[in-house]
Amino acid sequence: MSTTLLKKETLERKWYVIDAAGKPLGRTAVIAANILRGKHKVDFTPNVDCGDFVIIINTDKAILTGKKAEQKVYYRVSGWIGGLKETKARIMMEKRSDYAVELAVKGMLPKNSIGRNAMTRLHLYKGAEHPHAAQKPEAWTL
């Protein structure tokens, strides 16, 4: 009996909606990363990009547990000498919550072409509305 491997041509991609309101940021990111990777499928193949599309709504209502709001720091570099900028997680969640969720999911994906392709299937929205109703996404409960 031989193992059947998943091929790109026979792949079906579904759409899922995750509501991040009142949910911890990390747990939401773990679920999204697993769906983007395709680990929830029975025929998951590690070397094939077999993940589904993920829509995360209400990113502005995601929560940070513990002291992470004040202690976690996001860094970026302007490119100039001494141009290291830092932003606390509380400020990041107030101003750019979708980017904070994007960084969390990106850190949980593989650092290769499969991870980069998976990030193109992630859609983030601050409010409860999204323009992907035509794809008929299924709700994923945490």
Regions found by a protein language model. Name each.
Residues 102, 109-131:
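C-terminal structural segments of small proteins and small subunits
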